[in-house]
Regions:
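N-terminal signal peptide c-region/cleavage motif recognized by signal peptidases
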Residues: 13-17
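Short, solvent-exposed loop/turn elements at beta->coil junctions and helix N-caps
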Residues: 46-49, 189
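A short, sequence-level motif marking secondary-structure junctions
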Residues: 61-65, 87-88, 107-111, 187-190, ...
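N-terminal post-signal-peptidase region of extra-cytosolic proteins
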Residues: 70-79
């Protein structure tokens, strides 16, 4: 009789154990569903001012592994040829005919909009954040993410994850003071081929920049491998070669 009772108790408890959310694995899946570990992409960034005025940038980006990324500005003409490089927490901006690459920070913005450099040169979320908690909210999962170091642009992220697609739908980014810095919304699921199906649009706004808005539109994204040389300061002036 005791054995039967123990088996019955175990059967009741098993669904609770099985339903527990592994937040670390969930975040890793989010990273890989958003992008392959190594890839190339084409994006348009649009900054929208309160009066409706817009400024657009077209950017070619490449990434290798979890913490190396480089980007080349294709337009507007005033920015064409500029490039950025990120290795972990270190970032550089190269401007043609100005000299050697200059250091930049994650909270600055090479495009001058609501997206900062950390957004534009994003690494895997699992590289920069630990999972504090993961909750099942019925129609979505909610991940509470804490920055691993003080070098990360945001101290905390609250990420809503679509249960079926395991992709983010909304991220609130907070400073260490608890102040909301910005909200990012992921929209327009698109099949890019090669098994990549993700939001093609990311919109952001911030209480720090009232009535300003920035939009990131992905037009191309595919898995591609690159040599380590691509992710060095010496290659920043040669990124155009990757497109030939």
């Amino acid at each position: 009789m005791k054995i039967i009772k123990l088996l019955a108790f175990a059967a009741l408890c098993f669904p609770l154990v099985a339903s527990a959310i592994d937040g670390v694995e969930l975040l890793k899946k989010v990273d890989r569903n958003l992008e392959p570990e190594s890839y190339e992409s084409y994006r348009k960034l649009i900054n929208i001012e309160p009066n409706g005025a817009k400024k657009e940038f077209v950017i070619y980006s490449v990434k290798k592994g979890r913490d190396q990324t480089a980007s080349l500005f294709l337009s507007p003409s005033s920015d064409k040829g500029r490039s950025t490089l990120r290795q972990g927490d270190n970032m550089w901006l190269y401007i043609p005919n100005v000299g050697k690459p200059m250091r930049i920070t994650s909270l600055q913005s090479v495009t001058g909009g609501v997206f900062n450099n950390a957004d534009i040169m994003r690494l895997d979320y699992a590289v920069e954040y630990d999972v504090k908690s993961a909750e099942d909210k019925g129609d979505h999962f909610l991940l509470d993410l804490k920055a691993k170091t003080g070098e990360v642009a945001y101290d905390k992220l609250m990420m809503k994850v679509d249960k079926k697609l395991i992709l983010p739908t909304e991220i609130e980014a907070y400073a260490s003071s608890g102040m909301l810095m910005k909200t990012l919304r992921f929209k327009d699921i698109k099949d890019f081929g090669g098994g990549i199906k993700r939001p093609a649009t990311i919109e952001t706004d911030s209480p720090l920049y009232k009535d300003y808005k920035s939009v990131m539109l992905y037009s191309g994204l595919k898995k591609k491998d690159f040599p380590d040389e691509v992710f060095t300061q010496g290659f920043m002036s040669r990124l155009e070669e990757l497109r030939k």
